[in-house]
């Protein structure tokens, strides 16, 4: 009750009173933290600071928010990360991040999970103990581990489902008018299309086409992002205050999602508990059914708790929907933006037509999409330039004291290490004209090797799903994201549906120019409100 009274009082304050209150609160919090905090790895250099400096200046702290790309580029190129040395960089709020050199990547990927943990790192990053009420959804993310365990069967079942769902979503949201151009706000529409397509895999029909459920699902995702921004900048003492406040509406929306899931939950429980046939008896093939089947045997306490199962669905939605929406938005903008120079749209259509000729979705396999090398190249190039996780990649949390890096740094328990992934992906020593979107950069490389008889190995090396220390959108090593194979399928089916059935262009006021991405701290995001024109093709 006291919390609601406090929130009501805050709501009655004027704008400037609120700003003054927030600044005063943060000033006290930062002063308290400064007086009680020891330097973070005092022997390591600080990016952008003179030697022997042990604290980041206020100006460098502010650079994290208004010039982060340049600051991190300095840390990568000047003397540290690219040259085999760890370096410290400013992070959100009062925090400092440790950047490891690329030379330490293989060492880190070989460490056991009880020494370096990707799960703990993402639990800290996503702050789900506030937004979802517990850290278990990332520290024990079995809802995601199931995808890796059943990947082959999932992919083959997913192909016709994704094709059907994307076709329905495009018709609904882009329309079927073949005479007139329609202007859309791209990210808003892609959010709805991706939510529908991924929900076909996560909860199946008919819920994946329920607008109320899909809108709530994305509200929860945006609420989770809000909670991250409201907690990560602060020390734990302050997070305990800001976290519950920031996630209050998210918890209400999760309760409403639970109402949508309850009939489905009861139906699936009935199937599982009444069946007496072999494991191969037909069942729904969506992720929710897989989750219930697993929980029945391995997590009976969660199996019996719809609230926990609902939150695991929300965690799966966060992974599947949010990053895919951002990446697809960037992909489409890059295709339109490069069309005048590279004839991108027509080239992709030709490849799609050649690969799909004489087939239908029921006969498509993973190999069908492997042959789409130009589509693959476009997707990889878009991901290279628009790193979906910010600037840093392959985060690992240190779980025990005494672990020593190849450089001789004794890592402390609780430290999170990472790599400057986006800097490595635009390194001029590796790429010609690295800041330019070159849609067929990777398909040209594999074609050159085709002529030398190296086609299979070359294409695999440069494929969208192939990870390396220089390409980290999906991480690297044994914990590389297994969902990347599903993303690969979805992107290619999406391109096939979109480019086969629609013409694309810029609104007249864009004067043929692609709007630039924007930076928020270390996140590069699609231009807010970016619009495109679409028109159904007469095919």
From Swiss-Prot:
It is found in: Membrane. GO terms for biological process: secondary metabolic process. Disruption phenotype: Fails to produce tenellin, and accumulates pretenellin B. Also leads to the accumulation of pyridovericin. The keyword Phosphoprotein does not apply. The chain crosses the membrane at residues 13-33. Induction: Expression is positively regulated by the cluster-specific transcription factor tenR and is induced during cocultures with the natural competitor fungus Metarhizium robertsii. Gene3D superfamilies: Cytochrome P450 (1.10.630.10). SUPFAM superfamilies: Cytochrome P450. GO terms for cellular component: membrane. Its EC number is 1.-.-.-. Its cofactor is heme. Coiled coil: none annotated. It is a single-pass membrane protein. It is an enzyme of class 1 (oxidoreductase). Keywords: Heme, Iron, Membrane, Metal-binding, Monooxygenase, Oxidoreductase, Transmembrane, Transmembrane helix. Cytochrome P450 monooxygenase; part of the gene cluster that mediates the biosynthesis of tenellin-type 2-pyridones, iron-chelating compounds involved in iron stress tolerance, competition with the natural competitor fungus Metarhizium robertsii and insect hosts infection. TenB catalyzes the selective N-hydroxylation of the 2-pyridone nitrogen of yield tellinin and 15-hydroxytellenin (15-HT), respectively. The pathway begins with the assembly of the polyketide-amino acid backbone by the hybrid PKS-NRPS tenS with the help of the enoyl reductase tenC. This is Cytochrome P450 monooxygenase tenB. It comes from Beauveria bassiana (White muscardine disease fungus). The lineage of its organism: Eukaryota, Fungi, Dikarya, Ascomycota, Pezizomycotina.
């Amino acid at each position: 009750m006291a919390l609601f009274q406090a929130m009501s009082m805050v709501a009655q304050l004027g704008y400037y009173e609120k700003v003054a209150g927030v600044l005063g609160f943060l000033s006290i919090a930062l002063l308290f933290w400064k007086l009680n905090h020891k330097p973070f790895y005092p022997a390591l250099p600080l990016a952008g600071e003179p030697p022997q400096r042990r604290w980041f200046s206020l100006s460098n702290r502010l650079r994290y928010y208004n010039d982060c790309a340049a600051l991190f580029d300095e840390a990568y190129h000047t003397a540290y990360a690219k040259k085999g040395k760890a370096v410290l960089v400013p992070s959100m709020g009062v925090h400092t991040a440790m950047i490891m050199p690329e030379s330490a990547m293989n060492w880190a990927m070989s460490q056991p999970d009880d020494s370096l943990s990707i799960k703990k790192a993402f639990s800290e990053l996503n702050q789900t103990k506030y937004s979802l009420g517990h850290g278990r959804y990332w520290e024990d993310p079995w809802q995601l581990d199931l995808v890796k365990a059943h990947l082959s069967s999932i992919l083959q079942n997913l192909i016709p489902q994704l094709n059907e769902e994307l076709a329905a979503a495009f018709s609904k949201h882009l329309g079927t008018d073949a005479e007139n151009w329609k202007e859309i706000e791209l990210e808003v529409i892609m959010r709805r299309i991706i939510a529908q397509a991924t929900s076909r895999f996560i909860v199946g029909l008919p819920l994946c086409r329920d607008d109320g459920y899909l809108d709530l699902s994305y509200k929860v995702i945006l609420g989770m992002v809000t909670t991250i921004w409201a907690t990560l900048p602060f020390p734990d003492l302050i997070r305990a205050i800001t976290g519950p406040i920031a996630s209050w509406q998210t918890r209400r929306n999760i309760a409403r999602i639970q109402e949508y899931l309850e009939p489905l939950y009861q139906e699936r429980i009935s199937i599982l508990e009444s069946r007496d046939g072999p494991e191969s008896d037909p069942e729904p093939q969506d992720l929710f059914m897989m989750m219930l089947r697993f929980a029945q045997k391995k997590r009976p306490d969660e199996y019996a708790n719809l609230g926990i199962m609902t939150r695991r669905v929300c965690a799966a939605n966060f992974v599947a929907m949010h990053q895919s929406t951002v990446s697809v938005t960037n992909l489409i903008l890059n295709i339109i933006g490069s069309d005048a120079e590279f004839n991108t749209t027509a080239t992709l259509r030709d490849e799609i037509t050649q690969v799909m000729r004489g087939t239908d979705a029921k006969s498509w396999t993973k190999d069908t999409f492997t042959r789409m090398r130009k589509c693959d190249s476009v997707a990889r190039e878009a991901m290279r330039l628009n790193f979906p996780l910010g600037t840093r990649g392959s985060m690992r949390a240190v779980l025990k004291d005494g672990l020593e890096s190849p450089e001789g740094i004794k890592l402390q328990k609780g430290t999170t290490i990472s790599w400057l992934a986006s800097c490595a992906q635009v390194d001029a020593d590796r790429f010609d004209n690295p800041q330019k979107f070159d849609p067929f950069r990777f398909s040209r490389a594999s074609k050159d090797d085709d002529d030398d008889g190296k086609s299979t190995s070359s294409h695999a090396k440069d494929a969208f799903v192939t990870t390396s220390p220089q390409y980290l959108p999906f991480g690297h090593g044994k914990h590389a994201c297994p969902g990347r194979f599903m993303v690969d399928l979805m992107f290619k089916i999406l391109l096939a549906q979109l480019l086969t059935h629609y013409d694309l262009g810029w609104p007249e006021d864009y004067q043929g120019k692609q709007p630039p991405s924007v930076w928020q701290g270390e996140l590069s995001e699609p231009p807010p409100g970016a619009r495109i024109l679409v028109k159904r093709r007469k095919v």
